[in-house]
Design a protein with these regions (language model features):
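Bacterial Sec-dependent N-terminal signal peptides
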Residues: 1-24
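Alpha-mannosidase-like glycoside hydrolase catalytic domains involved in N-glycan trimming
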Residues: 20-111, 116-117, 143-158
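Polysaccharide-binding surfaces and accessory modules of carbohydrate-active proteins
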Residues: 21-23, 290-349
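Beta-strand-rich recognition/accessory modules
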Residues: 79, 335-412
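Short, hydrophobic/aromatic-enriched beta-strand segments in well-ordered soluble domains
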Residues: 90-101, 246-250, 333, 372-384
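Solvent-exposed N-terminal domain segments of exported/luminal and surface proteins
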Residues: 100-223
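Acidic, contiguous internal or C-terminal segments within carbohydrate-active enzymes
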Residues: 233-291
């Protein structure tokens, strides 16, 4: 009997030792007074594999303090990313261990649309975005900046269905036919399929043109913005469920007489965030230059915040319908590193014509060193969705910038 008890105790001890080897505790510390809800943290997959001694085919689960599964994603650069919630000045723990993950809803995702002039469009639960491609440029259209899709009444992906309806070949043919015989019916059908009209889930009511749009970065020669054009190549690196990442490379720019400066952007959007992280680099640049992130202004006296010290800029955009029927779009950019200067720059009457009627930009200007990376965050919200007022948007942006400058500490 004594031998049996000792054997059972030994077995329990062995099992508990094995369990401890087969789990990894991740401690997340928030040193700000602000709650951090749904913020993504990253753990290198190589560390998880080493810690858990995982076989190549093994799966993992991420558990919260109550033992409930948390959705996660392994990214293209081999990181386990998952959302955490931690109160102000607090610490929370998560556990990573072998197991079969539950199915996760796809929240952040995107697609390349060769059928729509090479658009790359992506979204999460809060909004959508797009960058224009080489086919648009080949047509002579000047769409330099990022475009926006508003979103409400759903957290599910909608862009694929919006594009499918907008580009529906049968309906397009019908519209062309009706234009000859019944222009009113043609217009009604056009409106019924257009993503420029809100059909209950959101729309594209943002004007870009030959501007920096909703937050493109550009080098500056003195006070002159060197506008990038459409991307040249695209590669989707992550496509959900929690993070979308795309790499865009651009045609060579002419910078101070050098015609071989090539810009690369890596843009990622996480579930639950209004802002895209963007990492910009320029190859073959020979000297340090100012780099700016800009938000196009469509009203010269529009509501603008340009706060260099606290690292963010915002603007209230009137949308393409100045009557107010489409509400207002809040746009903004936030910066983890120190911003040299933030200001409004209005255009002359001649420049307005060159920039499609835009009034100017609110700019955040930093210094770019050759061989480095310039990282910033940009995005938008809509007053028909969760963020209703400019004050609420400015608060979100100010807190976002604070969080960027005081990141969560992750230990394991």
């Amino acid at each position: 009997r004594k031998i049996l008890i000792l054997f059972v105790v030994a077995l329990i001890g062995f099992a508990s030792c094995a369990d401890s080897k087969q789990s990894m505790t991740v401690t997340v510390t928030n040193s700000l007074a602000l709650e951090r809800a749904g913020e993504m943290v990253e753990v290198p997959m190589s560390d998880v594999v080493a810690k858990l001694k995982l076989a190549d085919t093994a799966q993992i689960v991420v558990l919260d303090v109550d033992g409930q599964q948390v959705p996660y994603q392994v990214t293209y650069d081999e990181k386990v990313v998952f959302p955490v919630t931690v109160g102000g000045n607090s610490v929370v723990t998560y556990t990573i261990q072998p197991g079969t993950p539950a199915p996760f809803d796809v929240i952040a995702c995107g697609k390349y649309y060769p059928e729509r002039l090479d658009d790359v469009a992506w979204e999460n639960d809060l909004g959508g975005f797009r960058a224009y491609g080489p086919a648009l440029q080949a047509r002579g259209e000047r769409g330099f900046g990022y475009d926006l899709f508003t979103k409400y009444n759903t957290t599910e992906p909608i862009l694929e269905s919006l594009y499918a309806e907008e580009l529906n070949p049968e309906k397009r043919a019908k519209i062309a036919e009706l234009k000859k015989t019944d222009p009113k019916a043609a217009s009604e059908l056009q409106n019924a399929i257009s993503y420029h009209i809100d059909h209950g889930y959101g729309m594209d009511c943002y004007a870009v043109g030959p501007t920096l749009g909703a937050g493109v970065a550009a080098l500056m020669a003195g006070d002159t913005i060197i506008y990038p054009y459409c991307y040249r190549t695209q590669e989707i690196l992550d496509n959900g469920p929690l993070r979308f990442t795309v790499k865009l490379e651009f045609n060579p720019l002419v910078v101070r007489g050098d015609s071989n400066v090539v810009e690369t952007r890596v843009i990622s959007l996480d579930a639950g965030s209004y802002l895209n992280k963007t990492v910009v680099s320029y190859t073959n640049l020979k000297e340090a230059m100012p780099v700016t992130t800009g938000l196009v202004l469509r009203e010269p006296d529009g509501a603008v915040v340009a706060d260099a010290a606290n690292g963010y800029i915002t603007y209230v955009d009137p949308t393409t319908d100045r009557s107010g029927a489409n509400g207002k779009i809040f746009v903004g950019a936030a910066f983890p590193a120190q911003v040299k200067e933030a200001k409004v720059v209005l255009l002359s009457e001649k420049e307005k014509k060159d920039r499609g009627g835009a009034d100017g930009h609110v700019l955040a200007i930093s210094e770019y060193e050759p061989g480095s990376e310039y990282t910033y965050y940009w995005g938008s919200a809509w007053d028909k969705a969760a963020i209703k007022t400019p004050d609420a948007w400015n608060k979100y942006m100010a807190e976002y910038a604070q969080k960027l400058r005081t990141p969560l500490a992750v230990a394991y």
